[in-house]
Amino acid sequence: MGQPEKRVEERVRDWGVVVQDMMETQTSFILFGKRGNQSVVLKVIRQPGDEWRCGEVLAAFDGRGTARVFEYTEGAVLLERLNPGTPLASLALEGRDEEATEILADVIGRMSQAPELSPERLKAFASAQDWGKGFQRYLASGDNQIPRSLVEQGQRLYFDLCASQRDVRLLHGDLQHYNVLFDSDRGWLAIDPKGVIGAIEYEIGAGLRNPCEKPEMFASPVTVEKRLKCFESKLKLEPDRALAWGFAQAVLSAIWSVEDGFAVDAGNPSLRLADAIWPILK
């Protein structure tokens, strides 16, 4: 695999990128520059994890609702730079949540028009069932930050939904307000997928629990139902299943936070969403 810094140098050289600026995150090196006349972003992931195959996932959507991919390999992707790159979260945080939800639904709709993958290619990606193993890991860990009864409820619901899925496809897997950016030429587009195989109802879970820094904005039954009506109207999905996925994924998201080393209590945004959904689950 090599050191991340060396891999950055290799990708810059092999993909012909003239670097203009660079930033580092906990997980990645992100370089802004040009390839010929095209403004590009080069993202190099530090080590294998959720985003290791983000280039392959994005490329599979063929630019339908996503940033276009020019090159990719494991742990690195070269894609078009979105300008100005305003995150969808900015609309929601300005009090335009209904508009932001409609945009999120539109992006999901465009992504669902991507070419179908063969069964062999689908098997190459993690499935919703694979991600659900987090429930058992948590129950076996001895951690008690999340109530065991809540984890067990989430686990039962999650795997019931997995067992009854229809029309599974490649999904973004983390389609929330910070992973949808505005481009003046192409509109709102998704970036930074994790890639998971599941039904379309699975895709809205991340959007229900964001923008995560303002849980009071989304963690209420009224807001959840309002957002669900928008998704149902635009995507023709099954609202009861989408709501159930939203609950189960919220619990799983809190589990992932624990696994990532974060303290989790009742104020955790994902748990607050789970609490808001539970009374309206059918």
Predicted regions located by residue number:
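Conserved NTP-binding catalytic cores of kinases and kinase-like/nucleotidyltransferase enzymes
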Residues: 1-66, 183-185, 276-282
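An alpha-helical support segment within catalytic cores of ATP-dependent transferases
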Residues: 3-9, 113-173, 183, 233
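A conserved alpha-helical element in kinase catalytic cores
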Residues: 5, 38-78, 86-111, 220
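Active-site acidic catalytic loop and adjacent metal/ATP-binding pocket
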Residues: 24, 29-34, 69, 155-202
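Short Gly/Ser/Thr- and Asp/Glu-enriched loop/turn motifs at secondary-structure junctions
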Residues: 25-26, 72-74, 247
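A glycine-centered beta->alpha junction motif in the catalytic cores
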Residues: 47, 75-97, 113-117, 132-142, ...
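Active-site Asp-x-Gly
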Residues: 183-229, 236-239, 263-273, 278
